[in-house]
Amino acid sequence: MSELKYKRALIKLSGEALAGDKKFGIDPETVSNICREIAEVLEMGLQVSLVIGGGNIFRGLSSSAKGMDRSSADYMGMLATVLNAVAVQDALEKLGHATRVLSAITMQEVCEPYIRRRAERHLEKGRVVICAAGTGNPYFTTDTAAALRGMELKCDVIIKATKVDGVYDKDPMQHDDAVMYRQLSYIEVLQKNLRVMDSTAISLCMENNVPIIVCNMYKGGIKRAVMGEDVGTIVQGG
C-alpha cells in the first residue's frame, strides 16, 4: 500500500465542479468521475470528510447583490449544498464507500444532523462524512465552513480540489501567461488577495496551523496531495 502523508483530510469541492460543462445543475457523469478520484484515496486508508459548495444551483452573495435579503439568499445557498451532498453520497456509495451526510440545518428525513462527535465516529469507522449546509449561519461561505469543519474534525490537511492545477497570480483560464505558485504563506495569500479561500477561512487555518493544498481534482491530484508529493500549491506557515 502506498504511504499516506496525512491520516485525515477535508476535501473542499466547489458546487460548480459538479455541473461539468453544463455550468448549472448536477451532471451525474461528472459527479461519478470526481467520486472515482476520491475513492482512490479512500482505498489507500485515508479518512475523508467533504464540504461541497452550492454555486451550481444557487449563489447567495450574488443574489443578495441583486436585491434579495442576504440572510434569505444564504439560507437558499445552504440548501443547495444539501442537494449536492446527497448526489455525491449516492455516487460514492455506488462505488462501495459508506457515506453519511451531516447537515448543519436539521432535515432528519434526508440526512443526519451535524454533531461533531458523531462525525468523528463515522470517520473512525471508515465512512465518508459530507458536511452540508455550510456552518448553518448566513454570512459565512462554504470555504469558511470547510475550514471550521476541518478544525473540529482534527483534519491534518484541507485539500481544495479545483479545475486548475493550483493557485495562480491571475486567472489561468483567461491568461496564458498566468504563473502558478508552488508554495505560499497564509499572510501572502491575504496580502495578495489570492482566491484560494476567503479571508475568514485562511485566518482560521493560519491560527490553527492547518495546511491547505490547492490541486486539480483530476489527474490523480488528490491522491498525489495526500501522499505528500509536489503537486499543486501548498499554503502553510507565516
Curated annotation (Swiss-Prot):
It holds the Pfam family AA_kinase. Keywords: ATP-binding, Cytoplasm, Kinase, Nucleotide-binding, Pyrimidine biosynthesis, Transferase. The keyword Nucleotide-binding applies. Pathway: Pyrimidine metabolism; CTP biosynthesis via de novo pathway; UDP from UMP (UMPK route): step 1/1. GO terms for molecular function: ATP binding; UMP kinase activity. SUPFAM superfamilies: Carbamate kinase-like (SSF53633). The keyword Nucleus does not apply. UMP binds at G54, D74, T135, G136, N137, P138, Y139, F140, T141, T142. It comes from the Bacteria. Its EC number is 2.7.4.22. One of its GO terms (biological process) is 'de novo' CTP biosynthetic process. Belongs to the UMP kinase family. Catalyzes the reversible phosphorylation of UMP to UDP. Homohexamer. This is Uridylate kinase.
